[in-house]
A protein has these predicted regions:
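Dinucleotide-binding Rossmann-like beta1-alpha1 core, especially the glycine-rich loop
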Residues: 1-42, 168-173, 177-181, 204-208, ...
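Helix-loop-beta segment of a Rossmann-like dinucleotide-binding subdomain
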Residues: 2-6, 20, 40-79, 100, ...
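Acidic, proline/glycine-enriched N-terminal capping motif
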Residues: 301-448, 453
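Conserved, structured C-terminal
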Residues: 328-357, 363, 389, 463-723
C-alpha cells in the first residue's frame, strides 16, 4: 500500500473530508487531515498553493486485478475447480423457475447453481433467464502521460507515492512508474448498451477499452492541471475510455435472483470488493450466514417498480456523474422521481409535503402546512451539516403528536400475507418466539438467520387460525421467508403494492377514529398489541394497535384503491381535534426518545437480539430458527441510547464514539428529542460500557459529550401507549 490523499479545493469539501476521517475511525481505519504542504511532501505532483487541505490514509494501495484473479484462479484449481477458457456464454438455461445450465457457443454446461459474475456483460446474460439487473455499463476515461520529471525513473509501473483524488476536478491521479495515470469522472454519462457490449466482445481485441473521446476530457484535464501544474505540456502515451458497470445506486448487486432458483448474482464490483464479496456470497450460497451482512448490496433491495429500464438507466447515469459528489445521508434522489406514490400523494402535496424517496417510494419528511406551529416554539440553533434536508417544522409535528396526535403515511413499509395449513407452524419456526397465540394477537419479534443474526424485525398479526399479516421492512423479508419455507404448506404473498397504511398515533387517537368506526376502541376491548379486521370510514381495514412513536394509536392497512378515502376521512377528524399530518423526520425523533430500533440503520444480520437490546422480543418457548445460535454467541457490543448535552449538535449516521480518547463505537441514528429538550442517538458501544457513563462523539471536527442512557428517555414505563 502507498496510501491515498484526497484534496479539498473548497471549505465545503474540507469539512466533508474532516467527516471522512471520522467515518474512517468508526470502521477502524487510520486517517488524518494534512496541510497542503504535508500533502505535497508525500506526492510531488501536488502544488500546495492550489488547495486548502487533504485527507490522508496509509492503508490504501493499487490493486492488481489480473494478479488477484490469477492467484484466486490457481487456488480454486488446487481445490478441484475447472476453468473453461475462451468460451462465449450465450445464455442461462432454465426449466420453469429453476436454473439448469449455462448455454455456450460450444454447447450447454449442465448446472443447478450458477453465479453471474460477468461484469459489464452481466445484464445481458441475466436477461436470458428473465432477470433484470439494474445496471448499466459506463465508459470511464483514463490516460497515461509520458515520463514526469519529479517521479522516480526506471520503475516497473507500480505506484510509489500516494494515490490522489481531486474531487472538484472529478479526477484521480496515480503514478505508473515515472508516468502519471489519470482517471476522470468529470464528463457526461457515457452508457454502453447491452447489445454494444456483446458486439464489442466479438469485434474488439479488448472490449473493455473503447476509443478515447477528447471532448469529454478537456475540462477535467484543465482542472487537474490547476492542482498539478507539473503535468502541463505532457503528451499521453495511452488514452482510452474504459468500461465498467454501475448499478442504479452505485452499490454492488449481490445475492439470489428472486425469480430463478439456483441463480445468483455478483455484479458491479470493484477490485476492492472482490475477495470479501465472493466470500460473503459463497457463504450465503452454502446456507451459512455471511460474516459481513451485504444487505446494502443485496439485489432484492430493488423492487419491481425500480426495474424499469428507462428509470434505472437514469439512476445509473446519476450514480456515475455523482461518484465524487459530496453525499449527505439524508439527501434525496434528483431523478427519476414520482415512481411510487401513496394513494393520497396529491392530498399530501396539497399540504406542502417535503418529499424524499426510499426504494422509489415518495415519503413526506414534513408538511409546510404545519409551519404555523412554529410560532412560540424554541428551536435551538443547529449545526450546518445536520440542518441539511431538515426543517424545524419536524419538531412542531413531533410535539403535536405527543400533545394530540400525528397522522403518518406508512405506505412504503412491507406488508406480507402468510396463509395456509402450516402458516402457524411455519411462522412459529421462522420467528424468534411463538406468534400463533390466537386470533387478534399481535407479536413484535425478529426473523433470525441460522447464525442468530437479525434478518428483520417484524410485527405479526394473527387474523385467523391459518392467516397472518406481517409488517416488515423490505423485499428481502419476503425473499427470506420463501427461502426457509420448503416443506411447509404455506403461501407467502407480498401485498405492499396493492395496499396502503396510515398510522394514527397520539393521546387523542381514539377521539379521531371513534366517530368513523363502529369498532369499540376502548382499552378493555381493543388492547395494545391486538389486531382486528374492521371498517373505518366505510373502508375495510386491518387495524393493528401498535405504535412506533410511543403513543396510543393504530396502524390502518387497506386496499390502495380506498387509500385516499381513508386518508381524507382520518384527516377530517384530525383537523377537528387539532391533530396534524406528520412526516418521517418527526417519526425518527419520536422513536429515538423511546429507544425504538430501525432495522437497516441500527441493526443488521451481524447483530443478535441480545446485542441489539431486543431480548424482550424473543422466547425460548419452542424451536425457533437461529435462536439457539444467537444465545450461543458472545455479546461483545450493545446498541445503546445516548443523551447529548450539547443541544446544538445532532450527529449523523456513522460518526465515531470515543471514550478516554479511544474509538469505541459509532452512531447509527440521531435526532433532536423535542420532548426531552436535547439530541438523542443510538450507537454501538462495547458491552462493558454501562448506563450513566460519559462518552464523546466526534461531529464534523467538534467533540460533544453524551451520557449512556436508559433505552427510553421519554416515558420509560410505556404507560402512554397502553391507555
Amino acid at each position: 500500500p502507498v496510501g491515498s490523499i484526497e484534496v479539498a479545493l473548497t471549505p465545503e469539501r474540507l469539512n466533508y473530508l474532516v467527516r471522512r476521517t471520522e467515518f474512517a475511525a468508526s470502521w477502524g481505519f487510520s486517517a488524518e487531515m494534512l496541510s497542503p504542504e504535508e500533502c505535497a511532501n508525500l506526492n510531488p505532483l501536488l502544488d500546495p498553493t492550489t488547495f486548502i487541505g487533504g485527507f490522508h490514509t496509509t492503508g490504501e494501495g493499487i490493486g492488481k486485478a489480473l494478479r488477484g484473479a490469477q492467484a484466486q484462479g490457481e487456488r480454486a484449481q488446487s481445490n478441484g475447480a475447472t476453468f473453461i477458457g475462451n468460451t462465449t456464454v450465450t445464455g442461462i438455461e432454465t426449466v420453469g423457475s429453476k436454473v439448469t445450465g449455462v448455454r455456450t457457443a460450444t454447447g450447454v454446461i449442465p448446472a443447478d447453481l450458477v453465479v453471474i459474475a460477468a461484469g459489464g456483460w452481466g445484464s445481458s446474460i441475466a436477461s436470458t433467464a428473465g432477470v433484470t439487473l439494474p445496471l448499466v455499463s459506463m465508459e470511464h476515461q483514463y490516460a497515461v502521460t509520458e515520463p514526469v520529471s519529479v517521479l522516480a525513473k526506471g520503475r516497473d509501473g507500480d505506484a510509489s507515492v500516494p494515490f490522489v483524488r481531486i474531487y472538484e476536478a472529478g479526477t484521480y491521479v496515480r503514478d505508473e512508474g515515472d508516468k502519471a495515470g489519470i482517471g476522470s469522472f468529470n464528463h457526461r454519462a457515457l452508457p454502453v448498451s447491452d447489445s454494444d457490449m456483446v458486439n464489442n466482445a466479438a469485434n474488439l481485441e479488448d472490449p473493455s477499452k473503447l476509443p478515447f473521446t477528447q471532448v469529454d476530457w478537456d475540462q477535467a484535464w484543465v482542472e487537474t492541471l490547476e492542482v498539478m501544474p507539473v503535468l502541463s505540456g505532457l503528451k499521453y502515451e495511452q488514452a482510452y475510455n474504459g468500461v465498467f458497470p454501475y448499478s442504479a445506486d452505485g452499490f454492488p448487486l449481490m445475492g439470489p435472483a428472486p425469480s430463478v432458483d439456483g441463480l445468483w448474482i455478483l455484479e458491479c464490483l470493484w477490485a476492492t470488493h472482490s475477495i470479501g464479496a465472493a466470500r460473503s456470497l459463497a457463504q450465503a450460497i452454502c446456507g451459512i450466514a455471511p460474516d459481513i451482512d451485504f444487505a446494502p448490496a443485496d439485489l432484492t433491495r430493488f423492487d419491481d417498480a425500480e426495474l424499469v429500464p428507462a428509470d434505472f438507466a437514469q439512476r445509473c447515469d446519476n450514480a456515475y456523474i455523482d461518484t465524487y459528489a459530496i453525499h449527505h445521508p439524508a439527501e434525496p434522489s434528483t431523478s427519476p422521481r414520482g415512481v411510487r406514490m401513496s394513494p393520497f400523494y396529491d392530498e399530501q402535496e396539497n399540504l406542502g409535503a417535503a418529499f424524499f424517496d426510499t426504494s422509489a417510494w415518495e415519503r413526506p419528511r414534513w408538511f409546510e402546512s404545519n409551519a404555523g406551529l412554529l410560532a412560540g416554539l424554541n428551536v435551538p440553533a443547529r449545526d450546518a451539516w445536520s440542518s441539511k434536508f431538515w426543517s424545524p417544522i419536524a419538531g412542531a409535528e413531533h410535539l403535536k403528536t405527543r400533545e394530540i396526535a400525528g397522522i403518518f403515511d406508512m405506505t412504503s413499509l412491507r406488508r406480507i400475507n402468510v396463509t395456509g395449513r402450516d402458516a402457524a407452524k411455519f411462522l412459529n419456526y421462522a420467528a424468534a418466539r411463538n406468534v400463533a397465540r390466537g386470533t387478534g394477537a399481535v407479536t413484535y419479534t425478529m426473523l433470525l438467520d441460522h447464525n442468530g443474526g437479525i434478518v428483520s424485525d417484524v410485527t405479526i398479526s394473527q387474523l385467523a387460525e391459518d392467516r397472518f399479516f406481517i409488517g416488515g421492512n423490505s423485499p428481502r423479508d419476503v425473499v427470506w421467508l420463501k427461502s426457509i419455507s420448503a416443506g411447509y404448506d404455506v403461501q407467502i404473498e407480498d401485498v405492499t403494492n396493492g395496499t396502503t397504511c396510515i398510522a394514527v398515533w397520539g393521546p387523542q387517537a381514539r377521539e379521531i377514529l371513534a366517530p368513523i368506526t363502529d369498532t369499540d376502541l376502548t382499552n378493555d376491548t381493543f388492547k395494545y398489541f391486538n389486531a382486528k379486521e374492521t371498517s373505518v370510514a366505510g373502508v375495510a381495514v386491518t387495524a393493528v394497535r401498535v405504535s412506533y412513536v410511543g403513543e396510543l394509536g393504530w396502524e390502518l392497512a387497506c386496499n390502495a384503491s380506498a387509500g385516499s378515502q381513508l386518508w381524507n376521512a382520518v384527516m377530517a377528524q384530525a383537523n377537528r381535534v387539532g391533530a396534524v399530518p406528520a412526516g418521517r423526520s418527526a417519526l425518527t425523533s419520536l422513536r429515538l426518545e423511546k429507544g425504538y430500533r430501525a432495522w437497516g440503520s441500527d441493526m443488521s444480520r451481524e447483530d443478535t437480539p441480545t446485542s441489539a437490546g431486543l431480548d424482550f422480543a424473543v422466547r425460548t418457548d419452542g424451536e425457533h430458527l437461529g435462536l439457539a445460535a444467537a444465545s450461543a454467541r458472545a455479546t461483545t457490543r450493545r446498541l445503546r441510547t445516548l443523551s447529548l448535552t450539547d443541544i446544538e449538535t445532532v450527529p449523523t449516521i456513522g460518526q465515531p464514539i470515543f471514550m478516554s480518547g479511544k474509538n469505541v463505537g459509532y452512531i447509527t441514528s440521531a435526532e433532536f428529542g423535542w420532548s426531552v429538550g436535547h439530541p438523542v442517538a443510538l450507537g454501538w458501544l462495547p458491552a462493558e460500557i454501562n448506563e450513566g457513563e460519559v462518552v464523546q462523539i466526534s461531529c464534523g471536527g467538534t467533540t460533544v459529550n453524551a451520557v449512556v442512557a436508559p433505552d427510553a428517555v421519554f416515558d420509560p414505563t410505556g404507560s402512554r401507549i397502553r391507555v
